[in-house]
């Protein structure tokens, strides 16, 4: 987990929508410790009892238009109180004009003022998601993360079972590699877990007998992705002829990752099985279930109906014979 995000990093990563309006010399010294963005409302009326100074202060059309109705002395007072040492920056949306009193207060407190042409709601959601991803607590999982037809699939299993080789086969079939060997995961929201590669391992794979390969260099930029939501876990296990594997798909297993239960499918591996195609089909079948089509349930319903029909025919035949 990152304890902080540098303001300079946030500006650099969002340079297409953010600009430094004032206080460029103060940017490098500012750090952000919370992901929430704050729109000061009551503070403009003079109420500061619960003012979260440590957040980015976002002023949109509502805040700017209300401030314009205040007297000069009152504007100076409220903006001076808002400009604390803990405040990372002020952000003005919709390219609105910056109040002179805010500009002076920010300059005195060494606080940068940023501006964007985006709407207030949009920029708030973009920056909140950005900060949550970088401030979230991270865990590491041994496995390989790939994206199959837009769905994040985590391959797990014992060392040597063939996770990396299987992922390489999936990349050759047009899917994307996210992370090999070590997957860093974090909880994006209540029901969503995101996985990514550590910076040092990004786009790299280790293949026994070959060594380290650069997937982006060999297969192109379309073969890799920086991160993806983990929607399915596929656990590869060595084939055991004595084991009783699920043949119909009635068993529904899950794996807990970052306090979120992720559906898991166990796939036995042995010579002669095309694991890449099986995994591809497993992912598509999982997506079909999410869309409401469950082949296993349909088979079960058809079988139940067939048994019911035969039972009725047998009953009618017995009654007729009597």
UniProtKB/Swiss-Prot annotation:
Residues 268-273 are annotated as: Important for the catalytic mechanism of dephosphorylation. Keywords: ATP-binding, Carbohydrate metabolism, Kinase, Magnesium, Metal-binding, Multifunctional enzyme, Nucleotide-binding, Serine/threonine-protein kinase, Transferase. InterPro entries: HPr(Ser)_kin/Pase, Hpr_kin/Pase_C, Hpr_kin/Pase_Hpr_N, P-loop_NTPase, Ser_kin/Pase_Hpr-like_N_sf. Mg(2+) binds at residues 164, 206. GO terms for molecular function: ATP binding; magnesium ion binding; phosphorelay sensor kinase activity; protein serine/threonine kinase activity; protein serine/threonine/tyrosine kinase activity. Pfam families: Hpr_kinase_C, Hpr_kinase_N. GO terms for biological process: regulation of carbohydrate metabolic process. It catalyses: [HPr protein]-L-serine + ATP = [HPr protein]-O-phospho-L-serine + ADP + H(+); [HPr protein]-O-phospho-L-serine + phosphate + H(+) = [HPr protein]-L-serine + diphosphate. Residues 205-214 are annotated as: Important for the catalytic mechanism of both phosphorylation and dephosphorylation. The active site is at 142, 163, 181 (proton acceptor), 247. Belongs to the HPrK/P family. Both phosphorylation and phosphorolysis are carried out by the same active site and suggest a common mechanism for both reactions. This is HPr kinase/phosphorylase. It comes from Lactobacillus acidophilus (strain ATCC 700396 / NCK56 / N2 / NCFM). The lineage of its organism: Bacteria, Bacillati, Bacillota, Bacilli, Lactobacillales.
